[in-house]
Amino acid sequence: MFNPRSGWRAKSCTCCVPIFQVLGYHLADSFAKRPRGTPRRPGDCLTLQAKIVLLPGDGIGPEVIRQAHRVLEAVASQFGHQFEFSEHIIGGIAIDKTGEALPDATTAACKASDAILLGAVGGPKWDDPNAKTRPEAGLLKIRKELGLFANLRPIVTFEELLDSSPLKREIIEGTDILFFRELTGGLYFGPSGLEELPDGQQRAYSTAVYTTSEVERIVRMAAHAALKRRNKLTMVDKANVLEASRLWRRVSARIMKEEFPTISYDVVLVDSMAMHLLSRPTSFDVVVTSNMFGDILTDEASMLPGSLGMLPSASLGSSGPGLYEPIHGSAPDIAGKGIANPLATILAAAMLLRHSLGLEKEAATVEAAVKRVLAAGYRTADLVRRGEPSLGTVAITDHVLQSMVG
């Protein structure tokens, strides 16, 4: 891969082996954005120089980012790459230091990077509804600044953790769903406000707004992924009530009929989807939906594997750096205790390697290491029953690092 900022260096070797998807998810080549060049050539071992921005954020964010940083450094050392890391503030800590949830310096660093790894933002300290700004505003703004319109959340059950799920093994075993959540439209970005009424009451409103092009691009992206997976796409809406959902349904139907006729395509109302995720999650392959519906459904689905601490996500646009993060929150109740599960952030780092840097073998190495650690019986506190032994944040990462070279 050629990087206009620093460049690839290629050398002949025999170390490249066939690549397999350890966790069963990947992006289609047609939209896996690798803005700095072209895919690696079979038979070449290529050295990459890349700039990676770390955004630790709040709560347990700094702890899990620190461990993912260790893993990325190990990848660079093991495969001969050169990763340049820089750390910047976002969220509550940024509000405390600058008064803004996303300082200009952070935005500039992210735009100049090849990829971004985020910890978590928010916490009770900044929960004042009357505050000028909130930590979550930093996340919304960075998505907008970078043009990130698609959030990918893989929901994959690990065989080793099936008994950790609140659902029965026979319901969740084999679950492998890839959610595509639209990020730039809908209720979170439409017109909103608070009005004072003559009788002393207040009236609040939030408006869901979508354009044809916003729906088209996310549906196409999801469809390309379906072609690379099990060839099935489900679109979730509320078209029986909402006009914005009716637009989604019309546009999606046209795109699928005209451009992806070989894909098995269906639509499900959001309330039904919430039930289906708990009763028959293995029925779904790729799911595409709007901003708020995706936000809620993916949080629900995140409990299928047994813990939020196991699930990564990626936010991607048409070009430029992607943003990678665990889907769990800042968990301020355990911050600083050294017990946070870093595996979701480590898996997010693997997604970063694959989708922003084009390093498939390296990503698979990280994912395989995590899987071996779980197979060996190592667990963090969120993955065990009360009273059972568990490992801390650093210790579980130590095992991942050992497994990578073992």
Briefly describe each language-model feature range.
Residues 53-70, 75-76, 199-271:
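Glycine-rich phosphate/diphosphate-binding loop of Rossmann-like nucleotide-binding domains
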Residues 184-185, 189-229, 233, 239-241, ...:
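Glycine-rich phosphate/pyrophosphate-binding loop and the adjoining helix
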